[in-house]
A protein has these predicted regions:
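Actinobacteria-biased recognition of intrinsically disordered, low-complexity terminal regions
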Residues: 1-34, 40, 240-261, 293, ...
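Adenosyl-5′-phosphate
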Residues: 9, 35, 447-644
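Short loop/turn hinge sites at secondary-structure boundaries
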Residues: 87-91, 95, 162-165, 403-408, ...
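ATP-dependent adenylate-handling active sites, centered on carboxylate activation for C-N bond formation
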Residues: 111-113, 121-123, 205-486, 532, ...
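Proline- and acidic/polar-enriched loop/turn elements at helix boundaries
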Residues: 128, 341, 384, 587-588
Length: 644
C-alpha cells in the first residue's frame, strides 16, 4: 500500500528545524512511519510505502514553487514545469491533462493544491489536525492520526444507498476524515481549506452540443494509446531483485521468484476474452517501442507481452470467453498463461485478507483476483472501468428526451422489448424516461428518503425491470432491506439534509449524473481490490480510469452510447484505428452470467463460514443490521432463492 501525506499549518513561520512542520498538540514531532520526505517546513509532504523511484517526481521552480507528481505520469519535466506555472495562476485543469494515473501536489508559497482524478481511483482525504489540516491519499492513516471512531452513519448510507452521492456526501468510514469528490482539488492556505472543481460545467438551459461520433471515437483511441504508451515508456522493473537470498539447489531465478510469490518482470495484461482487456493487451503488444517482456526471463523470440487468462474450474459457462482469449493469444507477440482456479478461488472463499483503506464489494472476490495476479507481471494492465466509462446508464434515455432526440431511443428500447418479449416495453420505458426528465433532483432525493422510511424496496425483475428501476435520480441499494429502522431513518435524514444544502443539484442531466456516480463507486471498489489482492512489487494499471480517457469517453455522443453493443463497437473501431483488424468471432459478447453463477456457487460453498461470521456481526452490534434477518437471507440464497 502506498500513499502520500502532507500537512498545512496555520503558523506564519517555519516550525522547529527537523520537525518538518508536523508538531502535535503535546509538542511531539510526528513523522509517518516508512516515509520519504519530499519537501519540508512549513507545509511538508511525504511519500509513504514502497514507491518506485520513477513514481515519485519533484520539479522545483524556486524555493517556494514546486510540484510533486506521484504515480504513473507521461509528462516530461518541462511539461511539469509548464503545468506548475499554470497552476500558480489558478489553471488547475492543466495538472490533470497528462497521460497516466497520478496525484499532483503543487506548492506556491503557503498555498498547497492537491488534485484528485476524475474517476475517483486516486482520491484525496483531509482532516483538521493540530490547528491546521492534514491530507493524504488514504483515509486510514488520517484516521489513525486523529484516533477517529467509525462513522456509523456513513456505513449505513453505504449499505442503504451506495450509488447516491448525496447520502455519502464527503464522509468516510472514519469520523472526522473527509473526502474530496472526483474532479475536484483540495486547496490549502496556511491551514485553511477550500475544495474547488477543475472541470467546466455545462449549462442545462440549452441542449448539449452535438458531437461528431467519428471524431469522438478517434479521441478515445488517441487517449487510450497515450495511456498505454505512458506505461510502456516507463522503466522496466524486476520484482525483488535485491532480496533474492541466493542460489537454491535445483531452482533457477524464475523458480525462486515463484516460490517467493513474485510477479514476472516486465509488463503484462489480463486476457479474459472480453473487449476491454483484449483491447489493452493488443494495444500494448502492438505499439512500437520497448517490449513489455524483459530479456533473459524465459520469454520466446518476438513475444512482447505476458497475457494472463483465468480459467474457473469450479464453475462452467466460460467456454466462449476462454475460446476468444485463446484466439487473441494466438498473436505471436503475446506469451499466454492460463491460471486454473478451483473452489479455493470462488467468491467468499477467503475473507481473511489484508486490512484495506475502506470496505468494498471487492473483498468478496479478492482471493480470486489474487490467484490470477500472482501469475501476472510487475506492471499489469486490467480492463476495469471500461463498462462504466463507455456504456450508457439507463438514465441516459432521459437525457436524450431532454435534448429532444427521441428517435435515438428506438434501438435500445427495441432491444429491451426483444429480451422481455412484451409489446408493452416501449411504452413503459418511454414513460419512465419522460418522468425522470421532468423530475427535479430535489424531488428524486425526497422520494428515496420516503422509500427508505417506508421500507419500500420492491423492484421489477428482469432486464426491463432493472432498466426501469435505474430510471430514477436515486434508488436504494440491495442491502437496504437488511438494515434496521433506526439506520434507515438516519440515512433518510442525511438525504433530506442533502436537499437543504446550498447549491442543491448536481448541475448535470440525470443520466450523466448517475453515470458519474456509478463510475466513482466502481473506482473506489477498484482501490479496495488493489489493496486486498495486492501482490508485492506489482502495479495494477487501469487505463480506462485515466483522466484523459475518462474525458474522451464523456465526449461520446449520447446517441452512440445507448445503442446495443456500443462498447464493443467503439473498442473495435479503436483497435482498427491502431492497426488491429483481425478479431475473433463473438468479440464483445457479455459475460455477466458466469460471474453471477460463480458468486452463487461461492455463497453456497462458504455458507457455513458466512453464517458463523454473522453469528455476532459488528454491524449488528452497532445497530445497523438485524443479524437474524441477514442470516435468514444468507440461508435462503445458499439454497438457491433469488437475490435482491
Amino acid at each position: 500500500m502506498r500513499w502520500l501525506v502532507g500537512w498545512s499549518s496555520t503558523a506564519a513561520g517555519a516550525a522547529e528545524i527537523g520537525s518538518a512542520g508536523a508538531t502535535g498538540a503535546d509538542g511531539e514531532t510526528v513523522h509517518p512511519v516508512g516515509s520519504q520526505l519530499l519537501w519540508g517546513d512549513p507545509d511538508p509532504l511525504w511519500a509513504v510505502g514502497d514507491w518506485r523511484p520513477d513514481e515519485v517526481r519533484v520539479v522545483t521552480a524556486d524555493a517556494q514553487t514546486r510540484i510533486a507528481v506521484l504515480g504513473t505520469c507521461g509528462a516530461t519535466d518541462e511539461q511539469l514545469r509548464v503545468g506548475l506555472f499554470a497552476a500558480r495562476g489558478g489553471a488547475l485543469r492543466h495538472l490533470t491533462n497528462w497521460p497516466g494515473s497520478y496525484t499532483a501536489v503543487v506548492q506556491v508559497g503557503r498555498r498547497v493544491t492537491v488534485c484528485g482524478d476524475l474517476a475517483g481511483a486516486r482520491p484525496v482525504f483531509y482532516t483538521p489536525w493540530a490547528g491546521g489540516t492534514a491530507y493524504a491519499t488514504a483515509a486510514l492513516p488520517l484516521a489513525d492520526l486523529i484516533e477517529a471512531n467509525l462513522d456509523f452513519g456513513h456505513l449505513a448510507a453505504l449499505l442503504a444507498a451506495p450509488d447516491v452521492p448525496a447520502a455519502l456526501h464527503d464522509s468516510t468510514p472514519y469520523d472526522g476524515v473527509r473526502r474530496i469528490p472526483p474532479g475536484h482539488a483540495l486547496i490549502l492556505r496556511a491551514g485553511a481549506r477550500e475544495i474547488a472543481g477543475y472541470e467546466p460545467v455545462a449549462s442545462l438551459a440549452v441542449a448539449a452540443p452535438t458531437a461528431d461520433p467519428d471524431r469522438a471515437v478517434d479521441a478515445v483511441r488517441d487517449a487510450l494509446v497515450e495511456a498505454v504508451r505512458a506505461r510502456l515508456s516507463a522503466p522496466r522493473h524486476v520484482p525483488g531483485a535485491d532480496i533474492d537470498p541466493g542460489p537454491v539447489p535445483g531452482m533457477g531465478p524464475a523458480e525462486r521468484r515463484a516460490a517467493r510469490g513474485m510477479p514476472v518482470p516486465g509488463i503484462g495484461a489480463d486476457l479474459s476474452g472480453g473487449p476491454a482487456s483484449g483491447t489493452l493487451a493488443l494495444l500494448a503488444a502492438g505499439l512500437p517501442g520497448m517490449p513489455g517482456t524483459v530479456l533473459g526471463h524465459g520469454t520466446g523470440a518476438g513475444e512482447r507481452l505476458l497475457a494472463v487468462t483465468f480459467n474457473d474450474l469450479a464453475v462452467g459457462g466460460r467456454e466462449g470467453e476462454l475460446e476468444r482469449a485463446g484466439n487473441l493469444a494466438a498473436n505471436p507477440r503475446l506469451h499466454h498463461v492460463v491460471v486454473a482456479g478451483g473452489e479455493e478461488t470462488l467468491p467468499y472463499a477467503d475473507l481473511d485478507g489484508p486490512l484495506t483503506d475502506e470496505p468494498g464489494a471487492s473483498l468478496v472476490t479478492a482471493a480470486r483476483h489474487r490467484a490470477r495476479l500472482a501469475s501476472g507481471s510487475a506492471d499489469h494492465f486490467t480492463g476495469y472501468g471500461a463498462r462504466q466509462v463507455l456504456d450508457a446508464h439507463p438514465a441516459r434515455l432521459a437525457d436524450l428526451l431532454m435534448d429532444r432526440k427521441r428517435r435515438h431511443l428506438v434501438r435500445p428500447v427495441a432491444a429491451l422489448a426483444k429480451a422481455d418479449g412484451s409489446v408493452m416495453v416501449p411504452a413503459r420505458v418511454y414513460s419512465a424516461a419522460r418522468r425522470l426528465s421532468r423530475t427535479p433532483y430535489r424531488t428524486g432525493l425526497e422520494v428515496l428518503a420516503d422509500r427508505l422510511m417506508d421500507r419500500r424496496f420492491d423492484e421489477p425483475g428482469g432486464a426491463v425491470g432493472a432498466s426501469l428501476a435505474a430510471l430514477t435520480w436515486a434508488r436504494p441499494g440491495p442491502a437496504a432491506r437488511w438494515l434496521t429502522g433506526e439506520a434507515l431513518a438516519e440515512v433518510s435524514v442525511r438525504l433530506q439534509g442533502g436537499t437543504s444544502r446550498s447549491g442543491v443539484g448536481p448541475g448535470q442531466r440525470p443520466g450523466d449524473y448517475r453515470a458519474r456516480a456509478a463510475l466513482a463507486r466502481h473506482a473506489a471498489d477498484l482501490r479496495v481490490l488493489e489493496q486486498a489482492a495486492e501482490i508485492r512489487f506489482q502495479r495494477l494499471h487501469a487505463p480506462f480510469l485515466d483522466n484523459q480517457v475518462v474525458r474522451a469517453c464523456r465526449a461520446l455522443p449520447e446517441a452512440l452510447r445507448v445503442q446495443p453493443g456500443a462498447r464493443a463497437a467503439i473498442l473495435r473501431t479503436v483497435l482498427q484505428g491502431a492497426g488491429v483488424a483481425d478479431l475473433p468471432p463473438g468479440w464483445g459478447a457479455p459475460s455477466h452470467a458466469s460471474a453471477a453463477v460463480a458468486a452463487r456457487t461461492g455463497l453456497r460453498v462458504a455458507a457455513d463460514s458466512l453464517m458463523a461470521l454473522f453469528g455476532t456481526p459488528l454491524l449488528a452490534e452497532a445497530g445497523l443490521v438485524e443479524a437474524r434477518v441477514v442470516r435468514k437471507a444468507l440461508r435462503a440464497a445458499a439454497e438457491g432463492e433469488p437475490l435482491p
